[in-house]
Amino acid sequence: MKLTLKVETADTAYEVVTNLYVIILWERKYKRKASDMAAGIGVEDLAFMAYEASKLNKIVVPAEFDTFVKGLTNIEVVDTEAVN
């Protein structure tokens, strides 16, 4: 599954797209399966995926996840796409 996430901070707004690697990182960290997303996921889940996808796309983010989260003003799912 690919998610397009809109990330907003006090300074900027941008969109990132997750990939399989980001989803696997999320599964490992939170001990959940991608199929669990159908039942709904939390804001921290979205923030984690946005953080990892940002790093993969060479968007400069803080070294620590919590610092990244503190800087967020909003995060939302713009689009979803099932991986074939």
Give the label of every model feature segment.
Residues 1-14, 18-44, 48-84:
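Charged interaction scaffolds used for protein-protein
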